[in-house]
């Protein structure tokens, strides 16, 4: 179907592809290098949103390798319910070593307060404007004292551009 083809194209731009039998195959991925460059240039705590489970796991692993395991936590469908609030509490604690919140915007984009961050990176987007707006509002809400910067990682000439255009 067209939707399946579009999803596969999007996965490829993110650095992996899921085969028909459910196997995830990593691909050469410059996006993760770009993300690490953005993080190096960012100060303070950073929220990173990604659509795919494999991307969230890869991002968490790469950040842990670069900055240390204690600096990153992931928040997505596989995150146990009893751990989720402690991740948010730890991230909101300005004295905590937890600097990077990596999440799926459908899982973590609703109801959370993450105002300790003024940098939000979209590693990938989906077509839902509602999901995008809700995830943006995690950092930009009452309690935020700084201007929030939103960064979209976009591979030129790919489906990324179409998705971001649809969101605008």
Predicted feature locations:
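Conserved Helicase C-terminal RecA-like lobe
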Residues: 1-112
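Active-site donor-binding loop signature of nucleotide-sugar glycosyltransferases
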Residues: 11, 77, 125, 153-156
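A short beta-strand element within the Helicase C-terminal
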Residues: 112-125, 148-152
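Conserved beta-strand segments of the P-loop GTPase G domain that flank and frequently precede/overlap
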Residues: 49, 103-104, 122-124, 153-154
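Short amphipathic alpha-helical segments
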Residues: 59-62, 112-116, 133-134, 164-165
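Short, well-ordered beta-strand core segments
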Residues: 101, 119-121, 139
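Flexible glycine-rich beta->alpha loop in the catalytic core of nucleotide-sugar glycosyltransferases
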Residues: 108, 126-127
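A conserved SF2-helicase RecA2
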Residues: 127-168
